[in-house]
């Protein structure tokens, strides 16, 4: 058990900084919220992705510096980052009214396969990788996915997308494993 923990920790220490430095491999979404500073420009409302919660939140950007985890529109934040969030079925609601509604069919974007898949949403919480229809999931998350026929060869863009999905999955796995071990 300790050996597995050490191996995961080493992978985590090596891979996370590399990924955070690379915009194309989820680095933008892994960065913390950074409001910038007030030394220039005027403040504006933006959205950032909270990687811990898998959700996009609104914040005030002060106009200078900051980092790239900043989106003008919530839909851009969701399609760039939340579509990569791991499936979260939600939790049972404390409110009696919500509990009576029961579980609902929802769709999430599976970044491994690049497809929108059905799941049962319990009713409260969860993250932004949750859509009321397969169509809305595709519209937000699949719109930029490369389309190719079965006979065509993978392009560098396809390879990059698949590598991103694999790296995001590895990150999620390491993060979940490190939580269980600690």
Curated annotation (Swiss-Prot):
Its main location: secreted. One of its GO terms (molecular function) is serine-type endopeptidase inhibitor activity. Residues 29-81, 83-141 form the BPTI/Kunitz inhibitor domain. It is found in: Secreted. Pfam families: Kunitz_BPTI. InterPro entries: Kunitz_BPTI (IPR002223), Kunitz_BPTI_sf (IPR036880), Prtase_inh_Kunz-CS (IPR020901), TFPI/VKTCI-like (IPR050098). Residues 1-20 form the signal peptide. Nacreous layer of shell (at protein level). Expressed primarily in the mantle with highest level in the mantle pallium and lower level in the mantle edge. PROSITE patterns: BPTI_KUNITZ_1, BPTI_KUNITZ_2. GO terms for cellular component: extracellular space. Keywords: Repeat, Secreted, Signal. CDD domains: Kunitz-type. This is BPTI/Kunitz domain-containing protein 5. It comes from Margaritifera margaritifera. The lineage of its organism: Eukaryota, Metazoa, Spiralia, Lophotrochozoa, Mollusca.
